[in-house]
């Protein structure tokens, strides 16, 4: 395993640890989730560039689209919660149910 792959996996592990540690605030959770998605994107791009299989080249683009969608939904929830309650705590998400 090269040092590049190890650094990317370490970035994913640190983001996962941050997600588990700072799960009470929505902003910190979204930031850690974005770090996880970016490390997965870089890993998928490296794998796609090292293998010469043509169908795998679309995988990083699909992953980037999903990352953008989860960011948009997360920020919409953050704005909704902060406008309603003034706080960014994750436990306020249960109050948004119908």
From Swiss-Prot:
The keyword Nucleus does not apply. It is found in: Mitochondrion inner membrane. Core subunit of the mitochondrial membrane respiratory chain NADH dehydrogenase (Complex I) which catalyzes electron transfer from NADH through the respiratory chain, using ubiquinone as an electron acceptor. Part of the enzyme membrane arm which is embedded in the lipid bilayer and involved in proton translocation. Belongs to the complex I subunit 4L family. Its EC number is 7.1.1.2. The lineage of its organism: Eukaryota, Metazoa, Chordata, Craniata, Vertebrata. Coiled coil: none annotated. This is NADH-ubiquinone oxidoreductase chain 4L. The chain crosses the membrane at residues 1-21, 27-47, 61-81. It is a multi-pass membrane protein. GO terms for biological process: ATP synthesis coupled electron transport. GO terms for cellular component: mitochondrial inner membrane; respiratory chain complex I. It catalyses: a ubiquinone + NADH + 5 H(+)(in) = a ubiquinol + NAD(+) + 4 H(+)(out). Keywords: Electron transport, Membrane, Mitochondrion, Mitochondrion inner membrane, NAD, Respiratory chain, Translocase, Transmembrane, Transmembrane helix, Transport, Ubiquinone. Its main location: mitochondrion. It comes from the Eukaryota. GO terms for molecular function: NADH dehydrogenase (ubiquinone) activity. Core subunit of respiratory chain NADH dehydrogenase (Complex I) which is composed of 45 different subunits.
């Amino acid at each position: 395993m090269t040092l590049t792959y190890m650094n990317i996996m370490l970035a994913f592990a640190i983001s996962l640890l941050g997600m588990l540690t700072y799960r009470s605030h929505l902003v910190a959770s979204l930031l850690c989730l974005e770090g996880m998605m970016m490390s997965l994107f870089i890993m998928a791009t490296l794998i796609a560039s090292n293998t010469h299989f043509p169908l795998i080249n679309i995988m990083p683009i699909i992953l980037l689209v999903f990352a953008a969608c989860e960011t948009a939904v997360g920020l919409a929830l953050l704005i909704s919660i902060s406008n309603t309650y003034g706080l960014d705590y994750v436990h306020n998400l249960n109050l948004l149910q119908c």
